[in-house]
Amino acid sequence: MKGIFGVLLTILLCPFHAMAQANSTVFRFSDGGTATVREIVVGDPAAVDTLVFTYGGSGCTDLARYWLPTLADGMDIPARFMALNKRHVVSGQAQGGGSDACSREFRAWNLPRHWMADYMEFVSRTLAAEPGRWKNVVLVGGSEGGALAARVARARSDITHLIVVGDGGWSMRDNLSSLMGADVVEAAWKDIARHPDSAEALWRGHPYRYWFDTFDHAPLVDYLALGIPVIIGFGERDSSVPAASAHEVLRAARAAGKQNIGLVVYPGADHSLQAEGHDHLREFLRGAGQGIASGRLD
């Protein structure tokens, strides 16, 4: 792809601004359930032609607290940025990567089949409200949300770009086996498989039913099915997802003759692309945003 490699270079050269504030609305799903939507518009609301969607990663943090403002300020392009919180996320809530501190209602709903259905409905109805308006429709996913973004992008024909932070092509089983050892993971899996519907029994901060539904999906198949531009940002010292899983996406794409996927690995950086006081996350987002706005990722 003509623009991927130029954008990877541009990603390293970026100044920053203060974070924008998100507006809030409530989205009502076809089944009657609701979730909060956070929105930031950069530029003239009537003129912007880029729409950026993002969805929750692991846990129940309100995306307006950090992720959406960071995304909008980091990409720094005229666009409408929309974040769909998972159902049962409390406004203003801040919480770490697990779901053990989340409500029982959240844990009961926090399953991949629900994420996929909710995100698809939200994207479809948002696009249908203004048909033909958007030149660029971008999905951005971080961590667990990266795998979902890749799956949603694969399921649709109206997404133009995919940006992923901190997620690669391996399944959770393979990620955790690499980080913790296969014996530890297999022992945990045996107990999970005995109680696959439990929302009370927890492992690593998540209910067994969450693990049972997520353990063996490998996002690699979704990445390889995509023809749109994809950029993945990764920390070399990510302790949540091995960097090797991101390298596997690039290796498999090249082996398949695909040139639409780019990877940036930041030396010494963690799962959030932070390294010894350096905020590589914003660098990464800025380069991706400039590539989209300039057309070099088309």
Outline where the language-model segments fall.
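Short, surface-exposed "cap/lid" segments of acyl-processing enzymes
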Residues: 45-76, 83
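Short alpha-helix in the alpha/beta-hydrolase fold that links the catalytic acid
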Residues: 66-68, 228, 242-253
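Conserved alpha/beta-hydrolase
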Residues: 75-101
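Alpha/beta-hydrolase active-site loop
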Residues: 102-129
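Hydrolase active-site cap/lid region
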Residues: 155-202
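Catalytic active-site module of serine/aspartate enzymes centered on a nucleophile-bearing elbow/loop
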Residues: 267-298
